A protein has these predicted regions:
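Active-site/catalytic core of tyrosine-dependent DNA strand-transfer enzymes
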Residues: 90, 100, 122-169
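C-terminal secondary-structure termini that scaffold catalytic or DNA-interacting sites
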Residues: 82, 91-118, 125, 145-146, ...
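DNA breakage-rejoining catalytic core of tyrosine-based enzymes
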Residues: 11-16, 24-45, 53, 96-124
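Catalytic-site neighborhood detector that most strongly recognizes the C-terminal catalytic loop/helix
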Residues: 33, 91, 128, 198-224
C-alpha cells in the first residue's frame, strides 16, 4: 500500500495531489548474507546448467541487482564490448486501479525507484565472458531468453528451487544483493564505488544497510590490535 501511494505521488496522479501522507515506521529486518561456503554451494548448482534463470542469479550475485531490475533486463542492456549492464528499468506487479479490467494486479515496467538507481554497472571479466557466450537477441529478456518477461513472483519461485537443490536455508532474493555488497567490502572495494554500483544516492545507505562484516572479517580486524599490544611487540622480538 505504501509503495502504491509513493508511486502515485511520483507520477503526480490527481487522486493524491495536495494530500499529505504519514507512513508508519517499519523496523527493518536483518537480511541474511551467504557465507563464502554457502555461496560456493550455490554457484556449484548454478554452473551445472547455465539456464537463463541461473545466469540471472549469477548477475544478481555479482552485480547486486534488485529483483525488479533483473526481471526488466533485456540483452540490449548488456554491452559485451565494454562489459557493462545498463539499469534504467524495473519490472513489478502493482494494484490495478482500472475498474473495467477484472484483474486485481498488473505488471508495470517503468523507471527505477530513484534517480540514482539509473546506472551503468561495470561487470567482472568472467561474467562479461559468460554473458557473451549465452547472449541472445537484443529484444529478448535475459531471464527467459525470449521476448516474454519473467515476473518477480515466478523468478522468486525458481530461485527457491535453486536454493533447495544447493541444500541452503531460505535466503531471500535480496540476500544476493547484500551478499554482493559484503563480498565487495571484504575484497577492499571503496565504499563510494560500491554505493554507485548498488544505485544508492549516498554512501550512508550502503554503510548502514548493506555492509555485513562476517565473523571471520571481524576476527581479522581484531587481530590487527595485536601489533600495538606489548604481547604482540614482544612476540615479534621473540621470533626475530
Amino acid at each position: 500500500l505504501i509503495l502504491g501511494f509513493k508511486y502515485a505521488e511520483q507520477r503526480h496522479y490527481p487522486c493524491v495531489q495536495g494530500r499529505t501522507f504519514f507512513y508508519p515506521k517499519i523496523g527493518r529486518l536483518a537480511v541474511k548474507v551467504l557465507t563464502r561456503e554457502e555461496q560456493t554451494k550455490l554457484e556449484q548448482i548454478l554452473y551445472q546448467e547455465l539456464s537463463p534463470i541461473n545466469i540471472g542469479v549469477l548477475i544478481a550475485l555479482y552485480g547486486g541487482l534488485r529483483i525488479g531490475e533483473l526481471c526488466a533486463l533485456r540483452w540490449a542492456d548488456f554491452d559485451g564490448q565494454n562489459g557493462t549492464l545498463k539499469i534504467d528499468k524495473t519490472l513489478l506487479r502493482i494494484q490495478n486501479t482500472v475498474r473495467e479490467i477484472p484483474e486485481k494486479t498488473k505488471i508495470l515496467i517503468g523507471e527505477p525507484k530513484t534517480e540514482s538507481s539509473n546506472r551503468l554497472i561495470p561487470l567482472s571479466s568472467f561474467l562479461t565472458e559468460l554473458l557473451r557466450e549465452y547472449q541472445k537477441e537484443d529484444g529478448d529478456y535475459i531471464l527467459t531468453g525470449t521476448p516474454d518477461y519473467l515476473e518477480p513472483r515466478i523468478c522468486l519461485e525458481k530461485y527457491k528451487k535453486i536454493l533447495h537443490r544447493a541444500g541452503l536455508s531460505s535466503f531471500t532474493f535480496h540476500s544476493l544483493r547484500h551478499t554482493f555488497a559484503t563480498r565487495c567490502v571484504e575484497s577492499g572495494f571503496d565504499i563510494k564505488s560500491l554505493s554507485e554500483i548498488l544505485g544508492h544516492a549516498n554512501v550512508n545507505t550502503t554503510l548502514q544497510r548493506y555492509v555485513h562484516p562476517t565473523m571471520e572479517r571481524k576476527k581479522q580486524q581484531m587481530d590487527r590490535l595485536e601489533k600495538i599490544s606489548i604481547w604482540g611487540q614482544n612476540k615479534g622480538r621473540r621470533h626475530s
